[in-house]
Amino acid sequence: MTTRKRPLALLILDGWGYRENTHMNAVYHANTPVLDRLNKEYPNSLISGSGLDVGLPDGQMGNSEVGHINIGSGRVVYQELTRIGKSIEDGEFDSNPAFVDAVDKAIAADGAVHIMGLLSPGGVHSHESHIQAMCKMAVARGAKQVYLHAFLDGRDTPPRSAKGSLQAFNELFAELGTGRIASLIGRYYAMDRDNRWDRVSQAYELITQGKALHLYQDAVEALDAAYGRDENDEFVASSAITDADGQVATLNDNDALIFMNFRADRARQITRSFVDPGFDGFERAVTPKINFVMLTEYAADIKAPVAYPSVDLVNTLGEVLQNNGKTQLRISETEKYAHVTFFFNGGKEEPFEGEDRILIQSPKVATYDLQPEMSSTELTDKLVEAIESTQYDVIICNYPNGDMVGHTGNFDAAVKACEAVDACIGRVVEALAKVDGECLITADHGNAEQMTDEQTGQAHTAHTSELVPLIYVGRKGEIAPNGRLSDLAPTMLTLMGQTVPSEMTGHSIITLSE
């Protein structure tokens, strides 16, 4: 016979933010009697789900992946862009063992330090501030030859916007007294991810041999010439930049080659061409024995030092519940199933012991504004059934409607989506009351509360940086101000009378008064 549980549920209303401005605010205009009542009768607050509070750059809107990682891990998990930027600020970057080892070996062998990456402020695959820090660090350690191989963007930045970056690096090298931009090529070639090896080979030959379609004495001159050929940044053909004596830079034995992209998908192919012993993507004229460094791990089977290995998240909420012999359920529709499982568990695919999962198929419609309620009724049927079974200590549920319908930009549909979720919450709260359970109602980030762009008047389909709600439907108590998503797991453990592990840097923000 199974022991009867008093479940604690976490209901995540995806894309449901709070916004003072009520214009085209679907959350405000929706008829939500259940949430209105709960807000009057139970402790509630607003918490942060964006920017630095979830490990993103300041002001950056939150997203579902980041939100669920922060909620499930009970700590602020710094995303790569922020994590590396923070290490530069803290001074840790300059003593990073992978960088130090490669640079020092090159210097000792009288070799060169080559730095390659997407020279862009885009922040999607790389950030030029990281590349700048790497150039400074190499020179500070005594490198006499520093060569920058610049991949140009034009996708995550305007199509012709590289000139400012190139000018800034020309100035940087002048200040440092050594180093130069050695080559330019569009990301179309260097960062292919579809096994179009003919493209990658052009970048490889450019970096290793200085072999290029075009030869120039200055990077800005090279860019201007590319624009003259009607090549936008992304498509700039291979261009080698010579030194004052007309010599091109080449990659030789004992040189260091440091790849400054942090996003893996478009970094893998060119990396394999430099480090895989059995590489067969294209015929390589030269294969210098170099000290290669990946900024982050691009793939588990690429054998090269990694400057910033992925952080293994231990003692996430799911793991703590497992270790304490508790049972848990994860439930959502297809659209957010990975979020309440894989992302909530800190990037681990396998369920924990005692963790059950229920997947409800999202409706097969072209866009969700055609069915704004999505599969919320069926999801709630299964959720209520699970609550009534009293077999779970903790239930994690995500309602995707606010986000998925918010992305369509259809205001009327977003209002209907919010109303559908409100009705479902009424059923869930009622079921919990019958078994003496309680719940936290929150969101991972905003979306549906802003359905129009105030500047352009066009539909606003993106996430927002607004605060998100938190309601505690349970015992008497109060919620501390200034909470964030990483506080939810410690709060849940505290409500259950469980010890919060030291790895969780969030805090319990609910104080019970009974």
Curated annotation (Swiss-Prot):
Q: What is its EC number?
A: 5.4.2.12
- The entry's substrate-binding residues are 125, 155-156, 187, 193, 263-266, 336
Alphabetized SUPFAM superfamilies for the sequence: 2,3-Bisphosphoglycerate-independent phosphoglycerate mutase, substrate-binding domain, Alkaline phosphatase-like
Cite the Gene3D superfamilies for this sequence. Alkaline Phosphatase, subunit A, BPG-independent phosphoglycerate mutase, domain B
Gene Ontology cellular component terms for the protein in this record: cytosol
- Kindly give the HAMAP family that the UniProt entry links to this protein: GpmI
Q: Which family does it belong to?
A: Belongs to the BPG-independent phosphoglycerate mutase family.
Function of the protein: Catalyzes the interconversion of 2-phosphoglycerate and 3-phosphoglycerate.
The record's note on quaternary structure and interaction partners says: Monomer.
Entry protein name = 2,3-bisphosphoglycerate-independent phosphoglycerate mutase
**Gene from which this protein is expressed:** gpmI
